[in-house]
Amino acid sequence: MKEIVIVGAGYAGISAARKLGKTFKNDADVKITLVDKHAYHTYMTELHEVAGGRVEANAVKYDLQRIFNKYKKVQLVTDTVVGIDEATKTVQGESYSYHYDYLILAMGGEANDFGVAGVKENGFTLWSLAAAERIRAHIKECCAKAEHEPNQAKRRALLSFIVCGAGFTGVEMVGE
């Protein structure tokens, strides 16, 4: 039996799992396992809406079971990957180990502050659902403080926000 392990249920991981699930649908000699730390897919391109308070967090979470409902060949596993042993062809999760013959790494990327001074210490990233909720809470807190601030300069400072980055995420966040 050939075992294919896909690490990460973002756009690339889901796309790979669906394609492989369809390709090997009737092949009993192929096992496909999709491992992700969450039982849901986060619609990353909509995180700005959560951060801006336009939608609730659940609106950008998609249950992996629903996504793969008709892809019976794909086994979904919720686990956090902590290592990969190339010699033994094993993905090590916090809960289990997963042997593979073929491995697809689709964990996504990470936010980059490009070395801009002060961003890492004072800023937020918009790279996860939890981060979007932290940004929303921060904005609400600043607005609540500004509402009761009599000093115009302090009030303006509380209501001033800087977005570092003019990529898709940054531009969408400014639009919120």
Per-range role (PLM):
Residues 1-3, 74-162:
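FAD-binding core/adjacent interface of flavoenzyme oxidoreductases
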Residues 1-75, 82, 161-162, 171-176:
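Beta1-alpha1 glycine-rich phosphate/pyrophosphate-binding loop at the start
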Residues 165:
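Conserved glycine-rich "GG(E/T)P / GGGxP" loop and the immediately following alpha-helix
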Residues 168:
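Conserved anion/nucleotide-ligand pocket segment
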